[in-house]
Amino acid sequence: MTNIISVDTLLSASKLTCIREERILFDELSFEINAGDIVQIEGPNGAGKTSLLRILAGLSRPYAGQTFYVNEDINRCRDEYNEDLLYLGHLAGVKSELTAEENLNFNLRISGYDDFDTSAILAKVNLSGFEEALAGHLSAGQHRRTALARLWHNDCKIWILDEPFTAIDKRGVEELEQLFIKHADNGGCVILTTHQDMGIIKDDRLRKIRLDYRFV
């Protein structure tokens, strides 16, 4: 099935339904996310925010409905979609036995990049001087910034981020917000969850999708 959408639409959902343990987390949820959009998924704990992000990233299947990358079901264009997708879950995905530099190097290389300066990238997330520190010895904030560093060297259009501001201080949150705006202005989109208020991305720039679960 082909979904007819706007030429600016990068990602769309058609009648997505998700059920977990006899709870309907969301039902026949449809929306379009366009180039330039910054979208926050809202809802109480257990409402299905992470489940929705995982479905959009193709990591979980919905009970019903489809997700489309441009005009194609993501299950029919998996390679193309994955090349244009950066997904960061609420877990950092950082290996404790590797240094900050080794983690970044590993993450960028498995994403297909081979020309980058890890020290310069880590400096952008205030990790200068910690390049050789084992990730297991870093603070929670440094650990999270190690995971987020790949955002500063990435050409994927679609960013799906689960709680990117966790353990990040106010300055770090502002720097991430500025990066999100720049990415969107360059034709990408950002889909995220967060429990924190955003100070730089204003309501007129931020789209919101709210989830509220109910029992079957």
Curated annotation (Swiss-Prot):
<feature type="binding site">
    <location>
        <begin position="43"/>
        <end position="50"/>
    </location>
    <ligand>
        <name>ATP</name>
    </ligand>
</feature>
<dbReference type="GO" id="GO:0015439">
    <property type="term" value="F:ABC-type heme transporter activity"/>
</dbReference>
<dbReference type="Pfam" id="PF00005">
    <property type="entry name" value="ABC_tran"/>
</dbReference>
<dbReference type="GO" id="GO:0005524">
    <property type="term" value="F:ATP binding"/>
</dbReference>
<comment type="similarity">
    <text>Belongs to the ABC transporter superfamily. CcmA exporter (TC 3.A.1.107) family.</text>
</comment>
<keyword id="KW-0813">Transport</keyword>
<dbReference type="InterPro" id="IPR027417">
    <property type="entry name" value="P-loop_NTPase"/>
</dbReference>
<dbReference type="InterPro" id="IPR005895">
    <property type="entry name" value="ABC_transptr_haem_export_CcmA"/>
</dbReference>
<keyword id="KW-1278">Translocase</keyword>
<comment type="function">
    <text>Part of the ABC transporter complex CcmAB involved in the biogenesis of c-type cytochromes; once thought to export heme, this seems not to be the case, but its exact role is uncertain. Responsible for energy coupling to the transport system.</text>
</comment>
<dbReference type="GO" id="GO:0016887">
    <property type="term" value="F:ATP hydrolysis activity"/>
</dbReference>
<keyword id="KW-1003">Cell membrane</keyword>
<dbReference type="InterPro" id="IPR003593">
    <property type="entry name" value="AAA+_ATPase"/>
</dbReference>
<dbReference type="GO" id="GO:0005886">
    <property type="term" value="C:plasma membrane"/>
</dbReference>
<feature type="domain" description="ABC transporter">
    <location>
        <begin position="5"/>
        <end position="216"/>
    </location>
</feature>
<keyword id="KW-0997">Cell inner membrane</keyword>
<dbReference type="GO" id="GO:0017004">
    <property type="term" value="P:cytochrome complex assembly"/>
</dbReference>
<dbReference type="InterPro" id="IPR003439">
    <property type="entry name" value="ABC_transporter-like_ATP-bd"/>
</dbReference>
<keyword id="KW-0547">Nucleotide-binding</keyword>
<comment type="subunit">
    <text>The complex is composed of two ATP-binding proteins (CcmA) and two transmembrane proteins (CcmB).</text>
</comment>
<keyword id="KW-0472">Membrane</keyword>
<keyword id="KW-0201">Cytochrome c-type biogenesis</keyword>
<protein>
    <recommendedName>
        <fullName>Cytochrome c biogenesis ATP-binding export protein CcmA</fullName>
        <ecNumber>7.6.2.5</ecNumber>
    </recommendedName>
</protein>
<keyword id="KW-0067">ATP-binding</keyword>
